Curated annotation (Swiss-Prot):
Belongs to the UPF0282 family. This is UPF0282 protein AF_0504. SUPFAM superfamilies: Metallo-hydrolase/oxidoreductase. Coiled coil: none annotated.
Length: 287
């Protein structure tokens, strides 16, 4: 199995776009990319905008190679409703648009489905379902919280197994910070796990200390399973001090022989936390 992180926050954009290829099927999970409209009270820097445009082109190129696309929820860093032609001829597995969903995402889902009417695409609502493609099994969790509660809605986690190796994709759990989010991860016990991580850059503001501590403990529990590589990114890598704050997790990984890294490191590319460095980028313009 080949797992390719295309666009992630450690690569300079808000995204978790990931390409997964087995001998049986090629899948693109969450083909979307965006930027924080404001960070440090500043709009996106031109370097961020250029990177977003570059990453969107890369996502579209990889979408051409995919037979299946999965949308785990309807935030714009995980799907783009305005270029639906990329899904033409594909099988599209969608988080259910009207069940276990908040008002904001429900509206976005309805708009997305309306746009998809112009495209030849096979759509299925995938919450809690399992799909077989040859010897490859793709399984989706039941909807779990986007974060600590239902305010931001629900997401589905993704598990892919081809008889030789296994991969799990958390979507936006912001942790995992509760048992429901963790249960699917522990049940599947995948070898390679991609998790968006706790929202430490909002710690004490929109992300509580309790949720952070739960996330750390849950990640340590996951490390104690069969995982070989744990990728932490997205919400976590909006924080320049993310490694420092996750020291306990890195230590647990080291003791268990589990590699803990960002998506950029996994992909073998330079880590560039452009959003977290936005104020610095603007300052450089003045010098």
């Amino acid at each position: 199995m080949e797992v390719v992180p295309i666009a992630y926050d450690s690569m300079g954009v808000r995204s978790m776009a990931t390409f997964v290829k087995t001998a049986d099927v090629s899948i693109l999970i969450d083909p979307g990319v965006s930027l924080a409209p404001k960070r440090y009270r500043l709009p996106p820097h031109r370097i961020e905008i250029e990177r977003m445009n570059q990453k969107w082109e890369e996502i579209k190129e990889m979408m051409k190679k995919a037979e299946v696309a999965i949308i785990t929820h309807y935030h714009y860093d995980h799907h783009d409703p305005n270029e639906v032609e990329i899904f033409s001829g594909k099988k599209l597995l969608l988080k259910h648009p009207t069940e276990k969903i908040n008002r904001s995402q429900k509206g976005r889902a309805a708009y997305f489905l309306e746009q998809l009417k112009s495209v030849d695409v096979e759509i299925d609502y995938c919450d809690g379902k399992s799909y077989e493609f040859g010897n490859t099994v793709v399984e989706l969790s039941k909807p779990v919280f986007h974060g600590a509660d239902s305010r931001l809605g629900f997401v589905v986690e993704v598990y892919v197994e081809d008889g030789k190796s296994s991969f799990l994709f958390s979507s936006d759990v912001e942790g995992p910070n509760n048992e429901e989010q963790l249960a699917f991860m522990l049940e599947k016990s995948a070898e390679v796990v991609f998790i968006d991580g706790p929202m430490t850059y909002m710690l004490g503001y929109r992300f509580s200390q309790k949720s952070f501590e739960s996330s750390v403990e849950n990640l340590k529990r996951l490390i104690a399973e069969d995982v070989k590589t744990l990728v932490l990114d997205h919400h976590l890598t909006r924080d320049l001090r993310w490694r420092e704050k996750m020291q306990e997790v890195f230590k647990a990984g080291e003791e268990a022989g589990v590699k803990v890294e960002s998506a950029a490191e996994f992909a073998g590319v330079k880590e560039e936390l452009l959003e977290a460095r936005r104020a610095e980028l603007y300052k450089m313009d003045k010098n």
